[in-house]
From Swiss-Prot:
GO terms for molecular function: ATP binding; proton-transporting ATP synthase activity, rotational mechanism. This is ATP synthase gamma chain. The lineage of its organism: Bacteria, Pseudomonadati, Chlorobiota, Chlorobiia, Chlorobiales. GO terms for cellular component: plasma membrane; proton-transporting ATP synthase complex. It comes from Chlorobium limicola (strain DSM 245 / NBRC 103803 / 6330). Belongs to the ATPase gamma chain family. Pfam families: ATP-synt.
Length: 291
């Protein structure tokens, strides 16, 4: 049975931890507001660019741009994983890494067995996990979310498109967390390349005049589209991470509060038992002296 001193030490330690988790919750909440704003602001531009590309791709021969042309025989797959740099965010990293593992080892099991699956990992947690297990990592971006910048998204998009054009990848998939709400991020495995015309835009029926020509414009739009999509996914993942961390720290703070309540009850009971024992010993001693 723990002594009064043991219980006091535990109470002190839990109070200290509770202060840390409460502070981390407040920091995550502040970061979430900023991250959520950036993710929401990126959606209209990315969506409109996707719509324009869909309209154009419906009017040109997809063979004019190889990034629009799908390949019948998919032998090589590039998986872009967007995870977090840090932990203490609940099951955020665990869930996204599990999905990436499923995509690599199950969805494309044949390509994986033949060494045809490679990865680009953004975020320290995903990069460290797959590097230690011997997966083929083309590029890694640890600590990318410490100073999130569009240039990284552009570099990832250029690497992916370059590999596709050189035949080093027949399909490019991005695995990330899409931010829907604080309590409900959505795990997604989304095709980035090839750009499918039917998925590129919802409304391709508009009557537009293109200058100089759809083919020239599409060559300009495709790189912008890829960079913008990767950037949007990184912003979505960052917002989902902050939401997960805020929720996890809130839960930890509440758990600490409940544990403190239980320990205080145990401490008071132990203290009361010790006082009762001392009083009983005093009374017994007094009775012995009388006799």
């Amino acid at each position: 049975m723990p002594t009064l001193k043991d219980i006091r030490v535990r109470i002190k330690g839990i109070k200290s931890t509770q202060q840390v988790t409460k502070a981390m919750k407040m920091v995550a909440a502040a970061k979430l507001r900023r991250a959520q704003e950036r993710a929401i602001m990126a959606r209209p531009y990315a969506g409109k660019l996707k719509e324009m590309l869909g309209s154009l791709s419906a009017k040109v021969d997809t063979s004019l741009n190889p990034l629009l042309s799908s390949r019948q025989d998919v032998k090589k797959v590039l998986v872009i994983l967007i995870a977090a740099d840090r932990g203490l965010c609940g099951a955020f990293n665990t869930n996204i890494i599990k999905l990436a593992q499923k995509v690599v080892t199950e969805d494309y099991a044949a390509q994986y067995k033949n060494g045809g699956v490679s990865m680009i990992c953004a975020g320290s947690r995903g990069f460290d996990f797959f590097r230690k297990r011997g997966f083929s990592i083309v590029k890694g971006y640890p600590s990318v979310f410490q100073n999130l910048d569009f240039s990284v998204a552009k570099e990832i998009a250029e690497t992916a498109s370059g590999m596709y054009l050189r035949g080093e990848a027949d399909k490019v998939i991005v695995v990330y967390n899409e931010f829907k709400s604080v309590l409900a991020p959505v795990l997604k495995a989304e095709d980035l390349l090839p750009i499918a015309a039917e998925n590129a835009g919802k409304d391709n029926s508009g009557d537009y005049i293109y200058e100089p020509s759809p083919a020239v414009i599409i060559d300009e739009l495709v790189p912008k589209h890829l960079s913008t999509q990767v950037w949007r996914m990184m912003l979505e993942s960052n917002a989902a991470e902050q939401a997960a961390r805020m929720t996890a720290m809130d839960s930890a703070t509440e758990n600490a509060k409940e544990l403190l309540r239980t320990l205080n009850i145990s401490y008071n009971r132990a203290r009361q038992a010790a006082i009762t024992k001392e009083l009983s010993e005093i009374v017994a001693g007094a009775d012995a002296l009388k006799n």
